[in-house]
């Protein structure tokens, strides 16, 4: 009798426990993905503000960025969930401030090692210094592949995180770097797995110097993602997260979730994605947004996120994953401002605000930055000349900017002598003008400012072109690769060269009235033209420049700009008036 009672008690307990255990096993596992993009080696606070909502419908400018603050923000978000992973969507390095670029972005990689970055997709800028230097970023070492000496402070250990390049194939058909990764969270029957796919935009080959990517093939983004997502699911992934260096252009605030009015090249990729994708972390456009793509296409209810640039924002993505049915049951995301330190700009003081979280500097990361800054600061702070006002990169209706004209004039001055190439005109691409050049109150500009404006380290190239070839290059502003009438890439001309364009005319007939110092450009006449080495290789889809002959090498772009501004003296002349390009068709 007692034995029967004992068995009954055990059975009752088992019956009572079983549902509880089943519920525990079925309860979703929450995974957090902490994401950012387009960091561009912004180790120090970039003197950047994000406009954010304030009470009563007002707005406040919040100072953001700086890797020591970013590290602290990541740590705080991680503390909220041990099941966390940190990712980026490309352009982690290059086009960087001098404190990182002077050292080939080694300090940026080291800072990310300290932060605990897990995965980083390649972006177009990861290829700026060529494939071998990118591999050195991953694998470490001190072998020299550029004009700068690596390992100037310490031997470089390489990235402890994995760089992903799913759509970049080498000559043998293999990916240059791994294309995917998998992270496991939880144990036993509560274990879930999240797969990651990392890739860059297919047009990367048009955005970097061709010689640095010789032999590489950049494949279709959607095809690559879909194939990788299927493989990850077959390997047991319960969720698939895409890290892609391509993006969107939002109309609303940094943390708006509506997708209202959103545009951009990434939309063409999203419309073709496999429905097994759960999250798309994007970049490239330097915007911030969170879009529930299910509002656009109910059959593809994935999140699409982006976090501005320079470590200004972190996207905190939460996934609830069912460990029994092996799928995501809920997802959400928020963009978190990385509030850093106050500064003043032309609009006034940008102060810290209690309306948004503040983050202290991470001491280990701050010490790393200080060590490199001690070496770089004298170079950055060196005054090189004066300007009468700011040279802004913002273009007028014809696509011409003061900054672009200033750089083109510097290129011409550096190469116009008979012993320096005999150039009579020069062009620079508007995409190479990285930032505005804003002098101090007394007009002084520093080498660090010039480097921020021209950070790519391109050499000048002088070549002989016919007037017809020059015309063909200008036509490619509107019709070559990704360059279109809707999204042109404008060449910035040097003084003395003028022309007009009429977008109502058919392709190949839009450029009119080219003149040099008032005289018409003859299609069959020859001219010595200066461009940067990126354009000379056909960069930005300006393949017409490859037709040039009698090439002569020149100084680096930033050195030409330094010499030109230094020669202006204590009383510099007025800045270029942006009257070299005439738009003949209405906007």
What are these regions (language model features)?
Residues 6-14:
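Bacterial N-terminal signal peptides
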Residues 23-36, 58-67, 75-81, 233, ...:
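Non-catalytic terminal accessory segments
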């Amino acid at each position: 009798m007692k034995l029967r009672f004992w068995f009954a008690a055990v059975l009752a307990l088992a019956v009572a426990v079983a549902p509880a255990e089943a519920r525990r096993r079925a309860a979703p596992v929450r995974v957090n993905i902490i994401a950012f993009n387009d960091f561009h080696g912004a180790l120090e606070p970039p003197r950047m503000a994000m406009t954010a909502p304030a009470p009563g419908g007002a707005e406040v400018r919040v100072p953001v960025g700086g890797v020591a603050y970013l590290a602290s923000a990541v740590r705080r978000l991680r503390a909220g969930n041990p099941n966390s992973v940190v990712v980026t969507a490309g352009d982690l390095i290059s086009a960087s401030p001098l404190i990182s670029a002077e050292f080939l972005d080694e300090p940026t990689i080291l800072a990310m090692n300290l932060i605990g970055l897990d995965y980083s997709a390649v972006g177009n800028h990861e290829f700026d210094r060529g494939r071998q230097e990118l591999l050195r970023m991953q694998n470490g070492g001190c072998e020299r592949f550029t004009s700068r000496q690596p390992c100037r402070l310490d031997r470089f250990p390489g990235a402890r995180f994995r760089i992903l390049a799913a759509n970049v194939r080498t000559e043998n058909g293999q990916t240059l770097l791994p294309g995917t990764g998998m992270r496991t969270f939880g144990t036993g029957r509560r274990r879930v797995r999240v797969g990651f796919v990392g890739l860059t935009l297919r047009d990367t080959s048009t955005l970097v110097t061709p010689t640095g990517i010789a032999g590489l093939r950049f494949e279709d983004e959607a095809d690559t993602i879909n194939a990788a997502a299927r493989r990850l699911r077959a390997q047991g992934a319960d969720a698939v997260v895409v890290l892609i260096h391509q993006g969107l252009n939002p109309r609303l605030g940094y943390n708006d979730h509506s997708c209202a009015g959103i545009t951009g090249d990434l939309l063409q990729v999203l419309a073709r994605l496999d429905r097994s994708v759960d999250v798309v972390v994007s970049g490239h456009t330097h915007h911030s947004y969170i879009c529930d793509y299910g509002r656009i296409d109910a059959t593809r209810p994935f999140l699409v996120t982006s976090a501005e640039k320079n470590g200004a924002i972190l996207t905190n993505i939460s996934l609830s994953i069912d460990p029994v049915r092996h799928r995501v049951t809920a997802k959400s995301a928020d963009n978190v401002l990385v509030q850093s330190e106050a500064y003043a700009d032309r609009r006034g003081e940008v102060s810290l605000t209690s309306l948004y979280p503040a983050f202290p500097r991470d001491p280990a990361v701050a010490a790393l930055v200080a060590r490199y800054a001690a070496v770089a600061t004298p170079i950055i702070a060196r005054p090189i000349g004066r300007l009468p006002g700011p040279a802004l990169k913002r273009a007028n209706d014809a696509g011409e900017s003061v900054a672009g004209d200033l750089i083109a004039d510097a290129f011409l001055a550096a190469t116009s002598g008979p012993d320096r190439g005999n150039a009579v005109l020069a062009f620079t691409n508007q995409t190479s003008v990285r930032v505005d050049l804003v002098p101090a109150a007394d007009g002084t500009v520093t080498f660090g400012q010039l480097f921020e404006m021209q950070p790519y380290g391109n050499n000048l190239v002088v070549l002989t072109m016919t007037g017809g070839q020059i015309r063909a290059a200008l036509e490619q502003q509107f019709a070559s690769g990704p360059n279109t009438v809707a999204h042109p890439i404008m060449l910035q001309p040097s003084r003395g060269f003028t022309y007009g364009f009429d977008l109502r005319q058919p392709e190949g007939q839009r450029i009119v009235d080219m003149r040099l110092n008032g005289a018409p450009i003859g299609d069959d006449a020859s001219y010595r033209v200066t461009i940067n080495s990126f354009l000379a290789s056909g960069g930005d889809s300006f393949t017409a420049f490859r037709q040039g002959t009698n090439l002569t090498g020149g100084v680096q772009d930033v050195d030409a700009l330094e010499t030109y501004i230094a020669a202006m003296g204590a009383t510099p002349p007025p800045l270029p008036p942006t009257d070299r390009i005439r738009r003949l068709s209405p906007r």
